[in-house]
Amino acid sequence: MIIRSPEPEVKILVDRDPIKTSFEDWARPGHFSRTIAKGPDTTTWIWNLHADAHDFDSHTSDLEEISRKVFSAHFGQLSIIFLWLSGMYFHGARFSNYEAWLGDPTHIGPSAQVVWPIVGQEILNGDVGGGFRGIQITSGFFQMWRASGITNELQLYCTAIGALVFAALMLFAGWFHYHKAAPKLAWFQDVESMLNHHLAGLLGLGSLSWAGHQVHVSLPINQFLNAGVDPKEIPLPHEFILNRDLLAQLYPSFAEGATPFFTLNWSKYAEFLTFRGGLDPVTGGLWLTDIAHHHLAIAILFLIAGHMYRTNWGIGHGIKDILEAHKGPFTGQGHKGLYEILTTSWHAQLSINLAMLGSLTIIVAHHMYAMPPYPYLATDYGTQLSLFTHHMWIGGFLIVGAAAHAAIFMVRDYDPTTRYNDLLDRVLRHRDAIISHLNWVCIFLGFHSFGLYIHNDTMSALGRPQDMFSDTAIQLQPVFAQWIQNTHALAPRITAPGATTGTSLTWGGGDLVAVGGKVALLPIPLGTADFLVHHIHAFTIHVTVLILLKGVLFSRSSRLIPDKANLGFRFPCDGPGRGGTCQVSAWDHVFLGLFWMYNSISVVIFHFSWKMQSDVWGSVSDQGVVTHITGGNFAQSSITINGWLRDFLWAQASQVIQSYGSSLSAYGLFFLGAHFVWAFSLMFLFSGRGYWQELIESIVWAHNKLKVAPATQPRALSIVQGRAVGVTHYLLGGIATTWAFFLARIIAVG
């Protein structure tokens, strides 16, 4: 830490009225680009309009102006998020069975969408229990609302209106901070101040206020709900907040107020700030008192973290100093120069944030089922499957986005003349070693992981089960994973003396939590089948990384095209007369990386779906006998490719294929339609541009003959545009197919 003299007097950090508000400008499509604003000559115009509308780098090279546009766009994004949230809460208030579900969450399914009978589609309104007919939802909103203490639909209406007000406020803020008071570049680059405000404000005070809400509103209301009190009889949130005696009846230590806090007698608060671990046996969710404790602790950490960085007072950390001091014996200049990169290239900044947020999203996916946070979430199998799948897909897309923006940074913002012997330069200089080694790892993993399956298929086909890799023949137990499970299962009262239960039931220990005769969670056994599929995960993830990293490291130059940086982020080929140089741009690596990301995530969600149905989810009889949905067939069936096709894809597709005539029939139609969208993508991916240009010219000839030719000249999509349309339909078609397959299955059997 360095102590310096304080900064001079307050600096002016905004420009007043920098850009006039002009509806004429906004009404002219492509007003941000001189070329596009001229209007269309050919049909390529509409594609360029979409490609460049948000590419602020192409509108101007002024970093301050780009920063302001990004900042303003963020407010627009927040406005859309508030609008979406408002819609969710409004549906909960207007079209849902939330109050009925709250009264009996184990027998009534959540529904917040009722289909209007226009052409007979009211068949989609299935009976979700309690006499309510509607579409069963799997978003987890009901469970979240119960956890936050919402007991009636009026509260949902109020929240929906509040979200609309905030949406309007965000729209106004986006306009105000671009047209009326736009921050100067220095404000965007003041990282210490930004860290302090984001850490202490957003994360610190945000967590603290949520902890406060949980203690004063959620805990007492959930205590009543768990005890079976009718939601209409429970006092309203403001009564708990304003009347301490009400809370003191539930938690006697409340009567003492803040005295134990200031006298350091904190154990008095252990009634409602607990450290139990495990799940609440009534709801199958984490103990809400544990969650409140967690948010309070997190708030303290972030409030402290938000006071660590040096701003107007000459005390605290400076990010530049930290980065420049960060060098090891083998890393040359280390992180010197990174500060300049991250404060002048928003692509570099965004790349790191996307990589971290993507990884975090995938971690969230795993925690949502292993430590289900909300009441009655664990026994709502459709919602569990949806939340896992959703967070896995989102994480995958964010990580590919990280590679995309890293490559854009390399092409547009990287200055090789100022970088020497820092970490980035060193990585670039031995990129051949990195990529060739990574390639070797991919080949090794691919042949060995797939080879184990092929061996098993062959032995199975030849009728030699004793020679297969399985839990009953040649065992390949995941010993390291089992060791980690055991250390966590044994930790309470030994290495974690304060904890009474393990962090998650999945670690082991023999406990089972069932709610309303359904399994919420139990110890998840890992065996040979998991060992095999985990190596497929390793393989697909490493190939995705190989493609994306190669795209980044070779985005400026390669032996094939030494001057690649001059060609930009996306280009089809290195000009005429240079055969074999197509599809080498950084954009093309992102394009290919998306397909492998899709492979990776597909295997993960298939593994999860089958494993949970086979070994976790199911019913519990009065005698305590567990019957799993697929009867534990994962361990023996998933060890062959044939088993995956026969016992997972085909066997579990029966619900979606046979859904016609039932309330699940929309999933049958989506399954069909999404397959079509996916197949449509192949038309773009498997044919060349010239084919379409020739076809178009024939069609234009026919139009000319009939004198109906348009003024805008039709053109085939460029190579890059065609690939973009192809990958979009491939991914959307594939994801929607999986969605329909999963939901029809799990709603029917779960």
From Swiss-Prot:
It catalyses: reduced [plastocyanin] + hnu + oxidized [2Fe-2S]-[ferredoxin] = oxidized [plastocyanin] + reduced [2Fe-2S]-[ferredoxin]. P700 is a chlorophyll a/chlorophyll a' dimer, A0 is one or more chlorophyll a, A1 is one or both phylloquinones and FX is a shared 4Fe-4S iron-sulfur center. It is an enzyme of class 1 (oxidoreductase). One of its GO terms (biological process) is photosynthesis. It is a multi-pass membrane protein. Pfam families: PsaA_PsaB (PF00223). Its EC number is 1.97.1.12. The chain crosses the membrane at residues 70-93, 156-179, 195-219, 291-309, 346-369, 385-411, 433-455, 531-549, 589-610, 664-686, 724-744. Keywords: 4Fe-4S, Chlorophyll, Chloroplast, Chromophore, Electron transport, Iron, Iron-sulfur, Magnesium, Membrane, Metal-binding, Oxidoreductase, Photosynthesis, Photosystem I, Plastid, Thylakoid, Transmembrane, Transmembrane helix, Transport. Phylloquinone binds at W692. The keyword Cell wall biogenesis/degradation does not apply. One of its GO terms (molecular function) is magnesium ion binding. [4Fe-4S] cluster binds at C573, C582. It comes from the Eukaryota. PsaA and PsaB bind P700, the primary electron donor of photosystem I (PSI), as well as the electron acceptors A0, A1 and FX. PSI is a plastocyanin-ferredoxin oxidoreductase, converting photonic excitation into a charge separation, which transfers an electron from the donor P700 chlorophyll pair to the spectroscopically characterized acceptors A0, A1, FX, FA and FB in turn. Oxidized P700 is reduced on the lumenal side of the thylakoid membrane by plastocyanin. This is Photosystem I P700 chlorophyll a apoprotein A1. It comes from Cucumis sativus. The lineage of its organism: Eukaryota, Viridiplantae, Streptophyta, Embryophyta, Tracheophyta. The gene is psaA.
